[in-house]
Amino acid sequence: IVAKIVGVFLTSSDGILIVGASPFSRIIAKYLMKNGRRVVVIDRNEISVEKAKADGIEALEVDVFSDDLNENVELNDIGYLYAFTGNSSINDFAIQKYSRDFGENGAFRLISEEELINDSSIPAEGVFSRTDDFINLSEVVRDFPLIHEVELNSEKHFNSSIDAINKEPHSVPLFIKDKQGFHKIITSNTNLEIEAGNHLIYLGKQLNI
């Protein structure tokens, strides 16, 4: 915490902490790492952590309910928090516990099964996707474990592409990558400024968009 406050070690807070080491978390982590981001994955399941490490991902065995990461100076460049477990209680708790120290630039969680059924209960901010819960995302990764990039030529192109992806059950929109290579999470309540040359990043079945 001291390091984060005084900036002794911190050069930038663009690292990402992902709670949960499922196949969905791992494919997201590998993509972001390939694009130059530092990603740390935590999970209380030893086997899942070992699978992440085997994929070349920095991973720690951590129980969010009992383990404290706030004093870990090796995580002082983390500024984004993604809670991607299949347990909504763990996701909610992780956001509450870690967002102050590791989510200063953004903290996002998966929606619960109940929120998927009753979308009026989904908060306006802080969710990774408003249309896909852990089960849906896991099925997409199982059947189509691929991430695609589409170069956009206009905001109209973005809107038509999002519509096409949302209509395809086996595809999920993830990020907008700007010209500087920075990734912004797509949610239906996000006001994104789209420019020609931006890239739309999506998971799953490849579409002609």
What are these regions, as identified by a protein language model?
Residues 1-209:
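Cytosolic regulatory regions of ion transport systems
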